[in-house]
Amino acid sequence: MRGLISALVLTLVGSQHLNYQPDFGENKVYTYNYESILFSGIPEKGLARTGIRIRSEVEISGIGPKLCLIRIHSIEAAEYNGIWPTSSFSRSLKLTQALTGQLSIPIKFEYSNGHVGNLMAPDSVSDDGLNIYRGILNILELSLKKMQHSYSIQEAGIGGICNTTYAIQENKKANLVDVTKSKDLNSCEEKVQVVTGSAYTQPCQTCQQRNKNSRATATYNYKIKYTHNEAVITQAEVEEVHQFTPFHEITGGNAIVEARQKLALIEVQKQVAEVPPKEFQKRGSLQYQFGSELLQLPVHLFKIKDVERQIEERLQDLVETTYEQLPSDAPAKALKLMHLLRAANEENYESVWKQFSSRPAYRRYLLDLLPAAASHRSLRFLRHKMERQELTNWEIAQTVLVALHSSSPTQEVMEEATLIVKKHCPRSSSVLRKVCLLSYASLCHKRCSSPYSCSECLQVFHVFAGEALGKSNIEEVLLALKALGNVGHPASIKHIKKFLPGYAAGASELPLKVHETAVMALKSIGMRDPQMVQAITLEIFLNHKIHPRIRMLAAVVLLETKPGLPILMILVDAVLKEPSMQVASFIYSHLRALGRSTAPDLQMMASACRMAVRALSPKFDRSGYQFSKVFRFSMFKEFLMSGLAAKYFVLNNAGSLIPTMAVSQLRTHFLGRVADPIEVGIAAEGLQEMFVRGYSPDKDWETNYDFREILKKLSDWKALPRDKPFASGYLKMFGQELLFGRLDKDTLQNVLQVWYGPDEKIPSIRRLISSLQTGIGRQWTKALLLSEIRCIVPTCVGFPMETSFYYSSVTKVAGNVQAQITPSPRSDFRLTELLNSNVRLRSKMSLSMAKHMTFVIGINTNMIQAGLEAHTKVNAHVPVNVVATIQMKEKSIKAEIPPCKEETNLIIVSSKTFAVTRNIEDLAASKMTPVLLPEAVPDIMKMSFDSDSASGETDNIRDRQSVEDVSSGNSFSFGHPSSGKEPFIQSMCSNASTFGVQVCIEKKSVHAAFIRNVPLYNAIGEHALRMSFKPVYSDVPIEKIQVTIQAGDQAPTKMVRLVTFEDPERQESSRKEVMKRVKKILDDTDNQATRNSRSSSSSASSISESSESTTSTPSSSDSDNRASQGDPQINLKSRQSKANEKKFYPFGDSSSSGSSSSSSSSSSSSSDSSSSSRSSSSSDSSSSSSSSSSSSSSKSKSSSRSSKSNRSSSSSNSKDSSSSSSKSNSKGSSSSSSKASGTRQKAKKQSKTTSFPHASAAEGERSVHEQKQETQSSSSSSSRASSNSRSTSSSTSSSSESSGVSHRQWKQDREAETKRVKSQFNSHSSYDIPNEWETYLPKVYRLRFRSAHTHWHSGHRTSSSSSSSSSESGSSHSNSSSSDSSSRRSHMSDSSSSSSSHRHGEKAAHSSRRSPTSRAASAHHRPGSSLTRERNFLGDVIPPGITIVAQAVRSDNRNQGYQATAYVRSDAAKVDVQLVVVQLAETNWKACADAVILPLKAQARMRWGKECRDYRIAALATTGQMARKLAVQLKVQWGIIPSWIKKTSTALMRYVPGVALVLGFSEAHQRNPSRELIVRAVATSPRSIDTVIKVPGVTLYYQGLRVPFTLALGASSSSYETRDITAWNFLPEIASQIAQEDQSTCEVSKGDFKTFDRMSFTCSFNKSCNVVVAQDCTEHPKFIITTRKVDHQSLSREVHINTSSANITICPAADSSLLVTCNKESVLSDSGVSEYEKDNIKIYKNGKTVIVEAPIHGLKNVNFDGEILKVTVASWMRGKTCGVCGNNDREKHNELLMPNHKLAHSCSAFVHSWVLLEETCSGGCKLQRRYVKLNRNPTIDGEESTCYSVDPVLKCMKDCTPIEKTSVKVGFHCFPKATAVSLLEWQRSSDKKSASEDVVESVDADIDCTCTGDCS
C-alpha cells in the first residue's frame, strides 16, 4: 500500500513539471501553413455561393520574454463564385498582390501562457491588415487548466469576451493533448459589433427568447505537443458559422456565412528573428478594431482617387440621366454619389457647391445627398451655409431634418448639431424652429441610447422648458415637452412633472393641451424606466379631480409600459368605482383590445387583461360609441416571427359622437424588434361652433350687461374654461415626433378669407393666377436614403461579416400647366368667381418614382466584397397629358387625351438574388451570379423515366403535360421539385380596343421553394411584375380620346347616339325561317323518340341516378342558359300566340302591359324579350338541338325529387292548364319516361327564366353534364326532344284558351306563388339546420322578416300607382323590377320546392291559410300594379339629366366609344333613376343601371350585355318587422355573371369567416342560396341591433351590435307605418337622426325636472324666485334661461330667455294665452301674426306652445306651453351648460353640480344653489343666502366641535317670516369648540371656499316667506 501511494505521489510530482500551456521560445522560429476560407450563401446544394480563400505561410518568432513577432508571406488568394459544391475556387492575382501589400510588414504581439496581449504594429499597417493578423492570433488564444478536462469560462477573442467551453483529452504515450473548445458568439459579455440604423426600434426580449434571427458559434480543435519544458501547437482547425434568417430559424430558412481556418506546423528552427527597423505602436488587443468597413457601403465597390472630380462626374451623370426619364438605376447612382460625399472633406464640398449651387437641378441633389452623408463634415458645411444665409428656410428645414435623423451621434456630430440649434433655429415658433428642436431631440435620443453621455444635449432642453414655463409661452412649452418626449430619457421626468396636474403648484392652471403633451412625453421614457412612469401615470389616473382626457392618456402611457397583473387589478378596481363613463369605457375597451393580442411580448399582459375584462364585462360591455374607445387589430405569424398591429383610439368630450381627439398607430414586429413606423394624431375642438356662428369676436360679453348682473346673483359662480376653436395634429415616425401644427380660430378664418375675399388682399393668390395664365413649367426631384440598417460583426478569419439593408429612392415630378380664364380676372377677382368662368386648362405632367431596396449578407471591406445580395426595384411612371375645358356655368366639362402610341410601363417591380464577388484591384472581374440557375438543379432531377416500350406518342403526352403544368401556374407545387427550375410566367391583358389601348399585367417568378418550401426560399430567386399600357393597332388610327360631361338642360345636345331598345317583334321575321328549320328537326326527333320510348326508359333512369350522385345541388343556371339556347321552339310558339298583343318594356315587366292577360301568357311574352337575342344564335343542325336537349335532361332526378314536395298542390293545377302544370313541375311517376318528361318541362320553364337562381345550382354540374352527354344514347335524346315538343305544344294551346280559364289560371298561379315565396323566405333561417340544433341557435337567427311596405301602403290607398305597385312587390318579396318577373317568380317557386325539407310545406300551408281579406288585398293590386309598371325607359318621356361621352376620334370620323346617359324622375313618394351606357357604334350591347326609391323600400339593378340581357345583379332594400320589431333587409341576387366576378368573389369569401370572427360575429354553416346575399338588421333597443348576414355557404350573426345613434323607435312597433315618409326625406331623416344625437333636451315642470342627460329629479322649487334652468357656462355666456311661478297658487310659469342679442320673456295672460316680449317689445300679439324673426332669433307659436329658436347662440329651440318648459341645445354645447338642466356631458355622476362646481348633497340643495336672489323683496323674491351653524356639537377626532356650513342656505330676509320650509343636506366644516370662530367671522372668512367638509347634515331651508314693511 505504501508503495502504491509513493508511486502516485511521484507521478503527481512529475506531472506538475509537464507544460500544457503553448508558448513560443526565444530565438526560435515556428513556421506554419495557414489557410482561411470564407463562404456566404444558402446551405443547400445546387445554389450559388461566394467565397474567399487565402493560403500563406506564417512565421512566429520569440523575440523576447512574452513577446513574439508574426510574419506572413507566400500569400495566395482565390475567389469562389458559382454553384455549390460543383464550382471551384479561381486564383486572383490582383487580390493576392493587394493582400501581400497589406501584410508585408510583420507585427509584434504579447503572448504568455496561451493568452495574446497587446498588439504592436507600425502606422503603415492598415486596420484591415491588422485584423487579418488578429484572425491568426485568435487561434493561439487558449485557457488550459491542468486539473480539469471539461470546463466553461469567459474567454477573450477577436469577437469579444464570450462564453467558451473546453474539452481536453491527453495522450500520454504520444505526449499529445487534444483540445476542443466551443464558443457561443451570442453569449458575450463584451461583444464586438456595430449596429446602426435601429436606434428608433426596441428589442423584443420575448421574441428573441423564442427565436434568434442571428446565431453564431465557433469550434476549435487543437493538437498540442508537450514536453517538460514547452508545449507547441502542431495543428489547429477552426470552423465558425454565422446563421441569419429574417423569419423563424426552424421553419423560415437560413442564410449562412461560414469561416474556416487551418494552421499546421511545418518546422521549428533555432534562429534569431529579423525585426524591421520601424517604430511599433500599440494598436489594441486581440479584439477586432473596425476600420474601412464603416465607410464602405456593401452595395458597390469602386476606387476613390480624385474625389472632387468623381463627385462632379457622378452629379452630372445623375442630373442628365434623370432629366428626361427616371431610369431604374437612379437610386443606385444617388447612393454612389452619397458614398463619395461621405469620403470628401469641406474643401471638396465648397468647390462643388460654388460650381453647381446656381443650377436648380444640381442644387436639389446636393441638398438631398449632403445631409444623407451624415458626417460631421457635411453638417459643418451646411452650418456655414446657414451662417452666410445661402439657404432658404425651407432648404434649412429639410436638410436639418434629414441630416440629424441620419447621423450617428458621435461627439463631433453632437457639437455641430448643438451649434445649429442654438444659432440658426429662429426664436419664433415657426416650422423651422419646430423641425430643428424635434430633430435635435431625436439625435439626442440616439446619443442617450449609446454608451456615451448625453447630459449636454439634455441640458439644452431642460433649460428651454424652464424658460418657456417662466414666460408662460404656451407654444414654447408644447415644443419643449414634445422635444423631451423625443429624447425619452428618465432624467427629464422631474422637469416634466412641473407641467403635470397634481405635481406642481401652478400646473393645474395650465391649459389642457399642455397637460396632454406632458403626459404623452412620458410614453417614450417608459421604455427605459417603466417603474417610475407607472407610478406617475397610475397616480394621475386615480385622481378624479384631473380632467378625464388627461386620465385616459395617462392610462394609455401606463399600458404601454406593459404593467404586471397587480397594477392591472388596481386599474380594474378603480374602473369599477369610476364615476366617469368616458374613462371607464376607454379603459375597458383598451384592456379588451390588448387581451386579444397575439404578439409574443404582450402574451403575459394579454392574459392579465383577459382576467381584467372578465371582471369589467358585466358593467361596461354595452357602452355606446358616444364614449371614448380603443380599437386594435393585431396579427402575429409564428412561422415568420413577424407581426403587425394597428391601434386607433378616440377620446370623446362630454359624450359627443364627434371625437375631440383621435390617434392612429401602427406597430410592427420583425427581426426580434418592435417598431412604430407611423403614428398620427388629430385633435379638434370648437369647430362646430365656429362654423355655425361664423367669425365673431367675443364682444358680446362686453355689450350685454344683463349676463353679468344675473350671474352676480349666483353663489360663487365659476365659468368653465373656454376652449378656443382649434384644430391640431402631429406626425410621428418610429416613435419620434417629426412635426406638429395647430390652427386656431384666426388661422381658420384666414383660410376662409382666401376663398371668399378678393385676391387683391392676398397677393400670393393673384400671383398664382397670373402664373397659371402665362404658364407654369416645373421640375422637382427628391433623392432620399430612406433606410440604412447595418450590423457588422467580425469573423475568426479577420474579415467583417455584414448584414445590412438599404432603401433609397428618387422621385421626380415634372409638368407644364397653362390656364385660360374667360372672362379675364379683374383686380377685385375672387376665387368664387371661378364658378362662373370658363377655364381651359392644358397640362402635361408626369410622376416618376424609382425605388431600390438591397439586402446584403457577407464580407464587406474596401478591398473585397463577397456575399449574397437581394435587389428589389420598383419603377413607376404615371404620365398625364390632358387638355380640359371647364364651363361651370354651363355645367360642362370636356377633356382631350392623346391616344396610346407606344408601350408605356406604369409600374415595374423586380426582385433578384445574386451571389456577388468584387475585388477593388480587379473591378472588371466582378461577378454577380444568380443564386438560382437552371443548371443548379441536380441531374437526377432533370431526368425523366423512359419505359422500354415507350413510343413517340407517350413522349408527346409528357411534353404536353409539362407545358400544361407551367401554364397552369403550378410549376412550383410541392412534390414536383423538378418543375422549380422552370419560371412561372403569366400575362393578363384587359383590352380596351375601342380607345386603342390595353392594360397588361405580366408576372414572372422562379424561386428555390422546390428545394425547401420555406419563406426565405420562396423569396430567393427571380420575381418580376409589370403593368403597362400597350397600343391596340387598327386599320384607322385614333387621333385623340375625348371625354365630354354635360349636365343640365344641355345634356341632350351632347348625345352622339340616340338610345333605343330593340323590340323583339322586329326580330321575328328575320328569324322565322331559322325557327321553322329548328321545328322540323325537333318534329323528326319527336317521332323517333316515340318509337324508342320504352327502350330509353332504363337509360334515362340510370342517367338521372348518376346525375344525382355527382351533383351537390339540384340545378345550375349555366345549364339553364344552355337549355334556353338549344330549345328555340319554346320562344317560337309563345311568340306566335302573343306577338300582336305584346308591347316592349326594356326597363319594366312586360307582364304588366295588360291586366286582362293571363299569368302564363305574360310569362311567355316576358321570356321572349329576354331570350330573343340568345335564340338567334342557336345552331341549325340536329346534333346541336339534340345535344342541348340531352344536357338539360341530366337534371331529371333532381326535378323528380323536387316535384314530390309539391305533389298535392301541383296535381290540381296540372288539370287546368299545362302552363300551371309546368310551373308545378308535374307529378312524379313510376316510369322513367314520365319522370324525364317532368324534368324537361322544368328545364323548359327554367330556360325562360333569366332572373336569379337559388342555391339549388351546383357549380360543378356543367362538367358532369358534359361527361354524361358523350355516353348517352341517341334514342334517349330523341325521346327527350319529343317529350319537349309535346309539352311545348300543350303549353301553347293552353295559353290561347278563354279569358275565364286564364283568370282561374292567374288566380292559381298567384296563390301558388304566394305559398312558395312565403315558404322560401320563411325557411331561409333554418335551411339545412337539423331540428334538434335549431333550438341552440340565437332567436334572431330564426326570426322571420316581414316587409313593412304592404302595411305602409294599406294606409295610403290614394297614393300613385307606382306606390301601390311596390306594395304588391314588397309583400311577395320578389324582385319585380326585372324585365321578366313572371319567369322569376316561377323560378323562385321551383327553387323553393326543390329543397327537400318538410318545413317548407308546413310553412307554405300556413301561408295559404291567410285571411281572405289579405289575399283579396294582394289580388286587388296585382293586375297592372307591379312595381315595374312605370319603369319603362325614361328616355322616351324625359331628357337625360347628364350625358357622358367617351369617344375615340378617328381619322375617318366614324363614331367609336361609349355614351352614358342618366335619367331621373322623382316626386314626393318615388324616385326613379336610370343609367344607360351604349357603344357609339351601332351595336346592341348596352349596360343598364336603374333604381327605384320608394317609401320604406329601395330597389336597384345592374344589367349588361346584348340589350342589357346577358348579365344581371339586383338589390332590394326593405324595411319591415322581425318579431314585431323594426327591421331592415337588404337582398342582393344575381343571375349569370362573368367568370372573373365569380373568381374574385370566391377568393374574397375565403377571408369572410376570419374577418367576421375578428369583428365579433358568430358563424353557422348553411347551404344558403348560391346566388343570393341577405343582410338583416333588427332593432332590439334604441341603441343596439341584431344582425344576420347570409352568404352562400355560411350565415353570420351578431347580437347586440351597438350603433352610434339612437334609433327612432316609437311606443308602437308599427309607428313607422303612419309617418309621412317620402322618397326624398327617408335618407335625410336618418342623417338628421344621427346629427340630432348630440342635441339634448331638458324638461322642467311643476316640481319635476329631467336634465339634459335624461336624469329625472323631484324636489321643491322656490315659489317666487327665479331659478336658472339652463345657461351657457363658459366665460362668455351666449344665453341664460330662467323661470319662476307667476303666483303661489297657479301652476303657470314665466320664462326669461336672455341671449347676447335679445331678452325674451314669455308669461301667461289672464285668458290662459302666452304673452311674448322681445327686448321689452310685444311680439306675436296680433291674431294674424304667428312668427317673428330678428337677429338670428325666431319666435313662433304652434297652437298654445311658444317656440323660440336661436341656433347661433346654441339654443336649438325652447318650447313653453305655460306649465312645461323644454330646452334643446345645439350639439356643440355639449359639456358647456349648467343650471338645473345639468352640464350635458352624458355623465350621471355629476348632475347635481352647483355654480361653484361642487356636487350638491341633495336635489333641493342643488336647485337652491341656482336660485337668483334680489337685493330687495320688492321683486317678489324674499330670500337671501346665509351660512348656518349646526345645531349640535359633533365629536370630531375625539373633540367636541362647532360646525358651520360650507355652502350658504336659503333663508328669509330680515323682517320676513318663513311660510314654507324644506330640508336640505349641507356639508359642514368643524372647529374644536374651544377655539371655534363665531358665525359672523366664518361668513367674512375667505377660507370657507376651500374648507373641507367634516360632516354632512340636513338643515331647514326656507322656500317662501311673508314680509312686513321694508325688507332687506
From Swiss-Prot:
Phosvitin, an egg yolk storage protein, is one of the most highly phosphorylated (10%) proteins in nature. GO terms for biological process: cellular response to estrogen stimulus; response to estradiol. Coiled coil: none annotated. The keyword Signal applies. SMART domains: DUF1943, DUF1944, LPD_N, VWD. Residues 1397-1409 have a biased composition (Basic residues). Residues 1319-1328 have a biased composition (Polar residues). Precursor of the egg-yolk proteins that are sources of nutrients during early development of oviparous organisms. Phosvitin is believed to be of importance in sequestering calcium, iron and other cations for the developing embryo. This is Vitellogenin-1. It comes from Gallus gallus (Chicken).
